[in-house]
């Protein structure tokens, strides 16, 4: 079913009451175009978000009682045949140790919840290059999720996490010293040639502007013979 531009905008107005879960809403993953203006849905949504940037400040922060560092995240899967491809890729990257442009892989599946009832996901990958700590929102090579979904999910985690405690916990427990005040960014981390990469080759003016405003710089993954490389284009 196709929707008009106005129908999408009205739906966004309805969803704005809970920005912590906004990225999960079905319309964020719509891949087609509006029935009237023939704009990509993600362009209409990105334009709306640019008009309502203040709403993103309503994403509720959570301070985790336990350490953000999880002992035992060694990159070795309990079930190598699991169908959770994204998680297996993240573990392989952890075992690799570091990657160009993003630095050392500190952790994967970093929890954000403090108590079970909290509505929060997990950080796919956390990396540090000596200057910048990055929340990387990883998508598997065949993922058909939109770049907009990827951007908003990562940004939601950025607003949810207690940055100071995250840095303190990892400095204390991981063995990697991260100075107080280190910059924290949230970035899409998707495969070059995949659906999200292809979106970025198109005329996505509002999406690209939204990414600039949110400082959501995309990085593209290339896998060669079991080794992961990272590019910016």
Name what the model sees in each region.
Residues 1-233:
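Charged, terminal alpha-helix-loop-beta segments
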């Amino acid at each position: 079913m196709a929707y008009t531009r106005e129908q999408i905008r009205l739906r966004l107005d309805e969803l704005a009451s809970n920005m912590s879960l906004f990225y999960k809403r079905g319309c964020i993953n719509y891949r087609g175009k509006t029935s009237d203006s023939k704009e990509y849905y993600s362009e209409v949504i990105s334009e709306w978000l640019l008009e309502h940037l203040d709403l993103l400040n309503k994403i509720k922060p959570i301070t985790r009682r336990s350490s953000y560092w999880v002992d035992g995240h060694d990159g070795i899967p309990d079930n190598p045949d699991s169908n959770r491809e994204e998680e297996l890729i993240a573990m392989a990257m952890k075992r690799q140790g570091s990657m160009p442009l993003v630095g050392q892989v500190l952790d994967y599946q970093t929890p954000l919840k403090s108590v079970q009832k909290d509505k929060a996901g997990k950080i796919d990958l956390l990396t540090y290059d000596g200057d910048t700590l990055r929340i990387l929102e990883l998508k598997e090579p065949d993922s058909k999720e939109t770049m907009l979904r990827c951007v908003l999910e990562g940004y939601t985690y950025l607003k949810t996490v207690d940055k100071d405690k995250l840095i303190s916990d990892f400095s204390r427990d991981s063995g990697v010293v991260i100075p107080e005040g280190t910059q924290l960014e949230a970035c899409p981390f998707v495969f070059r040639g995949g659906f999200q990469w292809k979106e970025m080759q198109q005329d996505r003016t509002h999406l690209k502007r939204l990414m600039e405003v949110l400082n959501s710089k995309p990085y593209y993954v290339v896998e060669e013979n079991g080794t992961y490389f990272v590019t910016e284009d």
